[in-house]
Amino acid sequence: MARYTGSLCRLCRRESMKMFLKGTRCYTEKCAFERRKYPPGQHGHNRGKLSDYGLQLREKQKVKRIYGVMERQFKNYFEKATKMKGVTGENLLKLLERRLDNVIYRMGFAMNRRQARQLVRHGYFTVNGKKVDIPSYLVRPGDIIEIVQSGKELEIIKESLALAEQRGFPVWLEVNAEEMKGKFVRLPEREEMQLPVQEQLIVEFYSK
């Protein structure tokens, strides 16, 4: 599947928010977004007011970029969310939160979701004892995610986990840093995700 290969810092500036796409750099003064909090391009400083459609589009793009999902797959998640009980926008975010690459990032086993995808593809994780190398695999409440033995020696995982322990872990996850494994306890509530997005705009975008 196609992947974005351009500047990650440019994406944060485009969406006017820090999306933590580059790992440790995002937590330092070297972060490009901290130095230039305006959209990229010649008219970035003076970008005009967006139309309703423009606002809806930007919100969709923002969530896609946060989770590293391409358009076709994102739309599939949305269609799945519409068939679930509850609020469609919240259902969409909960589906994205269940992605294995996202869960690994949330558990602190990777600096960002991009790195988590790479680690999953290289076979460094098991779910309930079985190796899974598909980043989009949807984790279920009660699932146990563990790093394989060879992965436990990787410095990038050790460094990431150390930083995550300092920041703290999401309340819907249990992480055993010493054994390098975690449990997806339950689905997160909307307010627990701490995502500065307006998911209702995405619902409106696809409802046209």
From Swiss-Prot:
Keyword Ribosomal protein applies: yes
Highest taxon, organism lineage: Bacteria
Keyword RNA-binding: yes
Record domain S4 RNA-binding: where: 98-161
SUPFAM superfamilies: Alpha-L RNA-binding motif
Keyword entries, A-Z: Ribonucleoprotein, Ribosomal protein, RNA-binding, rRNA-binding
Gene Ontology molecular function, alphabetical: rRNA binding; structural constituent of ribosome
InterPro entries for the chain: Ribosomal_uS4, Ribosomal_uS4_bac-type, Ribosomal_uS4_N, S4_RNA-bd, S4_RNA-bd_sf
Pfam families, per database record: Ribosomal_S4, S4
GO CC, any one term: small ribosomal subunit
Biological process according to GO: ribosomal small subunit biogenesis; translation
Subunit structure as annotated in this protein's UniProt entry: Part of the 30S ribosomal subunit. Contacts protein S5. The interaction surface between S4 and S5 is involved in control of translational fidelity.
Function: One of the primary rRNA binding proteins, it binds directly to 16S rRNA where it nucleates assembly of the body of the 30S subunit. With S5 and S12 plays an important role in translational accuracy.
Family statement: Belongs to the universal ribosomal protein uS4 family.
Name used for this protein in its record: Small ribosomal subunit protein uS4
Organism expressing this protein natively: Thermodesulfovibrio yellowstonii (strain ATCC 51303 / DSM 11347 / YP87)
